[in-house]
């Protein structure tokens, strides 16, 4: 992730922060980790202007496919803003590949290989 974030700092990529990122981070009990993540969102994050109603509808349909609520919200948000979806959660990736996810989904290593980031 550090390699990808360094490219975000350089302006090559955008790091889209969703309301789900914020909500998940707000409940982290470790104040140091929580503050570090919030600072990262503030420094590097971009807020996308999307149709939250459509994203919510899509998230609900993904939940019906067996996605967890937070995972469904992350994926729906990525779809709504047309962002590539990067996760380290192999089970989530398996679900994404099984269902009709309209954006690129994979792990950080595959993102770096696909984008030829070194």
Question: Where in this protein do the model-derived segments appear?
Answer:
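Short, electropositive alpha-helical surface patch
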Residues: 28-42
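Acidic catalytic patch
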Residues: 20-23, 41-64
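Mid-chain, well-packed structural core segment of small domains
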Residues: 58, 67-74, 83
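PIN/NYN-family metal-dependent endoribonuclease catalytic core
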Residues: 1-30
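Acidic, PIN/NYN-like endoribonuclease modules and their adjacent C-terminal/linker elements
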Residues: 7, 47, 75, 79-118
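Residue-level signal for well-ordered alpha-helical positions
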Residues: 28, 62, 98-99
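Short, surface-exposed amphipathic charged segments that create phosphate/polyanion-binding patches used
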Residues: 62-66, 116-118
